[in-house]
């Protein structure tokens, strides 16, 4: 019963990993917090599935580093990464589905969700030199359109420019149109940004444009940037942590975004 309750706590647990230059190609470290939540349970094998993929999951071994105590995805990870063409700078969102299964969503260097169907179409136009490469292409091709909208609209990424980091009175960050429409930002007055265990309340500024209403992070955004030492070239990843209840009114709802940052030098904040 205790193991079942622990599994319930972990179900839908999400974390991200960034493929950094020089990182190991044969293993991927799992976040300390996730490993801690596993507790004494031994997770020896995981099943990875790209979001929307219809075929069987990929089997990947899980191991502990006896010296550091860190937990890694090991044997099988390199094959998964190669089949899905994971490269430096790619941003991976893992969702734990329970029973050692993970759903993985991949965002590439354009900060957009990767469309594996398009890559497969290009691969099919060429010839396959071995059964291994054919199998890998077939696995990549199974990514389908199911669920793409929900996942894609639950998060967005922005690389900071000078206009996002000007003096306190002029500082702002525009929210992508599709994201703000999906979460009804026109009816909201504020959002809460969470990072590194802390929270910042940011007021929203709405303005009318030819293509419709535009929403930007405004008052409170400056404090968030200063407190976290953000600079031009840093990339911020925003993900909906809690939607908030609009029925209580825009001023009273608690719409929460989880923020992670990839600094221009390759280090990360989360």
From Swiss-Prot:
CDD domains in the cross-refs: B3_DNA
Keywords (A to Z) from UniProt: DNA-binding, Nucleus, Repeat, Transcription, Transcription regulation
Keyword Hydrolase: no
Pfam families: B3
DNA-binding region: 13-110, 158-265
GO cellular component, one term: nucleus
Membrane-traversing stretches: none
S-S bridge residues: none
Main location as per UniProt: nucleus
GO molecular function terms noted in the UniProt entry: DNA binding
Gene3D superfamilies documented for this protein: DNA-binding pseudobarrel domain (2.40.330.10)
Protein localization: Nucleus
Protein name: B3 domain-containing protein Os03g0212300
Organism the protein comes from: Oryza sativa subsp. japonica (Rice)
